[in-house]
A protein has these predicted regions:
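Transmembrane helix interruption/hinge and helix-loop junction motifs
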Residues: 90-95, 112-114
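Hydrophobic transmembrane alpha-helices and their membrane-interface boundaries in multi-pass
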Residues: 15-93, 100-106, 120, 124-129
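Conserved small/polar residues in nucleotide/adenosyl-binding loops
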Residues: 158-164
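Interfacial aromatic-anchored transmembrane helix boundaries in multi-pass membrane proteins
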Residues: 86-93, 128-154
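Short, Lys/Arg-rich cytosolic juxtamembrane segment immediately N-terminal
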Residues: 8-16
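Short, Lys/Arg-rich, polar N-terminal cytosolic tail immediately upstream
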Residues: 1-9
Length: 166
């Protein structure tokens, strides 16, 4: 079987698009449930929807205009989901919010581009650290939360380090 770079890019973009949409559907339903139960105001849910779905729409437009083999789509995922992830990290009190990045990080391995994965890992780590500083300055953290931040940081480093195996 012969390697075809165009077919590889098409396959990677289609797979990541499917995973990204599924992840956003799950998060949208979860956030809707939390909003209905009074955990978030409706305005926060509207902002969530915008941060969640506008990057997907932009990605779909780019795929339609440039074709599924476009190398730009991976950057749309990284930037679009990165902004959405930052919104979640900064607006939720849950220490588990950092896991929302793990499915996307594992998706990026499909592109088999070590430098790209490392750059995304650095960006994700900056978001987690900035979120921890933000929550600390807002008085939201307890001393036990710092252990959680250490775990988050370690998970992100490990995920980024997996790029060395490419």
């Amino acid at each position: 079987m012969e390697y075809n770079e165009k077919d590889f890019k098409i396959s990677a973009n289609r797979k990541t698009q499917k995973v990204w949409i599924i992840l956003c559907v799950i998060l949208t339903m979860s956030y809707a449930s939390d909003t209905a139960n009074g955990l978030y105001p409706k305005t926060a849910y509207v902002a969530f929807l915008l941060f969640c779905w506008i990057p997907i729409i932009i990605g779909r437009i780019i795929l339609r205009l440039q074709g599924y083999a476009t190398p730009i789509y991976k950057d749309v995922i990284a930037i679009g989901y990165g902004i959405f992830y930052a919104y979640i990290v900064f607006t939720t009190d849950s220490q588990l919010a950092f896991i929302y990045i793990l499915p996307v990080t594992s998706m990026l391995i499909l592109y088999k581009n070590r430098g790209f994965i490392v750059r995304c890992g650095i960006f994700n780590t900056i978001i987690v650290v900035a979120g921890a500083v933000y929550h600390y300055n807002a008085g939201i953290n307890s001393s036990a939360d710092f252990k959680n931040y250490q775990l988050q940081f370690s998970c992100l480093l490990y995920t980024s380090d997996a790029a060395d195996d490419l």
